[in-house]
Amino acid sequence: MARDFSLKNTRNIGIMAHIDAGKTTTTERILYYTGRIHKIGETHEGASQMDWMEQEQDRGITITSAATTAQWQGHRVNIIDTPGHVDFTVEVERSLRVLDGAVTVLDAQSGVEPQTETVWRQATTYGVPRIVFVNKMDKLGANFEYSVSTLHDRLQANAAPIQLPIGAEDEFEAIIDLVEMKCFKYTNDLGTEIDEIEIPEDHKERAEEARAQLIEAVAENNDDLMEKYLGDEEISVDELKDAIRQATTDVEFYPVLCGTAFKNKGVQLMLNAVIDYLPSPLDVKPIIGHRANNPDEEVVAKPDDSAEFAALAFKVMTDPYVGKLTFFRVYSGTLSSGSYVKNSSKDKRERVGRLLQMHANSRQEIDTVYSGEIAAAVGLKETGTGDTLCGEKNDIILESMEFPEPVIHLSVEPKSKADQDKMTQALVKLQEEDPTFHAHTDEETGQVIIGGMGELHLDILVDRMKKEFNVECNVGAPMVSYRETFKQPAQVQGKFSRQSGGRGQYGDVHIEFTPNETGGGFEFENAIVGGVVPREYIPSVEQGLKDAMENGVLAGYPLIDVKAKLFDGSYHDVDSSEMAFKIAASLALKEAAKKCDPVILEPMMKVTIEMPEEYMGDIMGDVTARRGRVDGMEPRGNAQVVNAYVPLSEMFGYATSLRSNTQGRGTYTMYFDHYAEVPKSIAEEIIKKNKGE
């Protein structure tokens, strides 16, 4: 069966924004206008097509990135709706990895908000071209010019409008297209009837000025256009479109559009811009992987149906009807249902049962998926997020994704014996779906500990266990993931010698420990000369240190950011063994704890609080009382924004405190930023608590 849409006519896009900027509603409208749904669902009524999990409908936020496919003007548009809440950054991260372009949705009243900055940074990391849709132009306080200025001020983005709104709030009635110099007026509530009219006289001058600014911004990286512009030559619509497309695809320019998805204005024009300015799989740089057996040999996955099959699995989900669904993006070649593929990341052979094209939560079975497309497979048992799938002869591994470690932990226990097994299965499935969610059993207490990226993240996962897996569990108080590190260098000896009749045990090491830079992790250096410690025991020394570091030296927390140099030692021909050197290394670490000034580190969160100005004093006082450090303040519209770094341990229950301090008018976002040393008095309390004193 031949493909329905050529690669040139395919777009893989994400819709990303701050929570509540109207992202899901925008996606809904796209589906409505492209004929994918026949009735529009509202997020605040819990009826949205894209928010298909129960928790999403209850909370009115998007958690999982639902992938859906739509058609517009002879093009296939695959859309991934990504969550805007900071606890779900991993969802954004993994969808950006497989997209060719994105639509950033802004709230016309607030402009760029904290989470917009986070996802914008992630998109820049992955080199994703973007167009910006200033949504909610009908909202009280909507200000298009202000929103555009926040793109420059907060993101330093080379952005310029390619549209201008006529009116705002209740008066928002038409949109000027600056590329074609036309005006579009909406005449019915559903936004399906649009009149093309001349630009009204009183808006002509403003439109011409804005067009000149647009050409200037695009021409910065386009010599031909710059020449014409400086020579006052006429620039045709096609020339300008080509230049905008080129600059957008090169991630050097961001076109800005406007509208209101809720009131059905501007969405079709935004869809036109997706087709006109965002790249097809052919326009982006081909993805480069490496050979599975030789990491230094680069392999290019070309977007070509006749090439060897290569795809990246970017999401795993459990569907109540079909079981495990693996979403993947095909970079080269084709895949048919019923065929075998190789998971080159794990070196496993897998059989693809069925192939599905998803539409939020309904699905259509397909026989073949082609390069540049996004689909879901049923039947892949071993494949997880970030794994490469390829043809059995192909041996490519595409660059995988890196996921942050959890910063918050809770203990969970099943309410009844019957829930025990179900809970174990639920935790295994949830970990498969979400790489930032960890679960393990504490060896000392026997408790099951779950870890994630924030309170809301874990809340929702516990909620899912109850609703999807029927597991009732009791949840303990949140626990912070502390770490330990050394502040001073020292040289120490670790010697293990045991004689108890028969063969003894002997291992002796001299190790120099030095602090590593923040985030540098553990580095081991072998500086042994002349074989005083035989080569076969060196890995045991490193492993012994790693194992001992897991349990720290002060309060049982992992020791991080330390360098260890093995420079001397001794061995015994008969009595030395791998185990003896492992124990010697752990004894050296114990010795280092006495000399290297160990300290406890705590996770520091970057917190952004927005509230009316009159509450500023209370909020600042509260941040200081929580051991926070204010990093700056700025006015935003008629509100004030405070940026601060606050220890995670002080942020539990902050939502309630902020509500009472601002009478419900304040909002905040926070995400993990770095680890910092805990004050001595608090460190002593932590150590006492962990030793059970």
Swiss-Prot record:
InterPro entries: EF-G-like_DII, EFG_II, EFG_III, EFG_III/V, EFG_IV, EFG_V, EFG_V-like, G_TR_CS. Its main location: cytoplasm. One of its GO terms (cellular component) is cytoplasm. One of its GO terms (molecular function) is GTPase activity. Residues 8-282 form the tr-type G domain. It is found in: Cytoplasm. PANTHER family: RIBOSOME-RELEASING FACTOR 2, MITOCHONDRIAL, TRANSLATION ELONGATION FACTOR G-RELATED. Belongs to the TRAFAC class translation factor GTPase superfamily. Classic translation factor GTPase family. EF-G/EF-2 subfamily. This is Elongation factor G. It comes from Staphylococcus epidermidis (strain ATCC 35984 / DSM 28319 / BCRC 17069 / CCUG 31568 / BM 3577 / RP62A). The gene is fusA.
